[in-house]
């Protein structure tokens, strides 16, 4: 018998997102390694128990891009948390079925290194390739159920973006 999940009874997974910009204000976009179709996104991930959001952001950046904290400069933090809900076809299939979506705190960092220093082939690899893109292209490239979050994040950090 198939179990029906009521998303309203599930919490949001606490997460962080990182808008990483280069010197020109272009955004780091990674192609998800687990997607057979184009699915570009910015680095993001869960906040571990006892971890502060900013610590989680720097850890996730390292895990997903190989970029250490010393190679980025903090620029801004979004004032509010943003949420998204998983679409019905993913509900119960990701994160052990424990969450209805994510509640994210977003950070903007400027990358101080070179493209050659980016290393997406980490122990926690999430991207198969990466590139620098403009804000509108980033919003257009994200999966539809996360698009409203990306629109809000881009609007928040607009003065710093190309």
From Swiss-Prot:
Entry EC no(s): 3.6.1.-
Disulfide bonds: none
Matching InterPro entries: Nudix_hydrolase (IPR020476), NUDIX_hydrolase-like_dom_sf (IPR015797), NUDIX_hydrolase_CS (IPR020084), NUDIX_hydrolase_dom (IPR000086), RppH (IPR022927)
Protein name, per record: RNA pyrophosphohydrolase
Superkingdom, natural source: Bacteria
One Gene Ontology molecular-function label: guanosine-3',5'-bis(diphosphate) 3'-diphosphatase activity
Organism: Cereibacter sphaeroides (strain ATCC 17023 / DSM 158 / JCM 6121 / CCUG 31486 / LMG 2827 / NBRC 12203 / NCIMB 8253 / ATH 2.4.1.) (Rhodobacter sphaeroides)
Record NCBIfam families: PRK00714.1-5
CDD domains recorded: NUDIX_Ap4A_hydrolase_plant_like
Family the entry assigns: Belongs to the Nudix hydrolase family. RppH subfamily.
Motif (Nudix box): 45-66
Pfam family of the protein (one): NUDIX
The protein's required cofactors: a divalent metal cation
One GO term (biological process): nucleoside phosphate metabolic process
Entries under HAMAP family matching the protein: Nudix_RppH
Function according to Swiss-Prot or TrEMBL: Accelerates the degradation of transcripts by removing pyrophosphate from the 5'-end of triphosphorylated RNA, leading to a more labile monophosphorylated state that can stimulate subsequent ribonuclease cleavage.
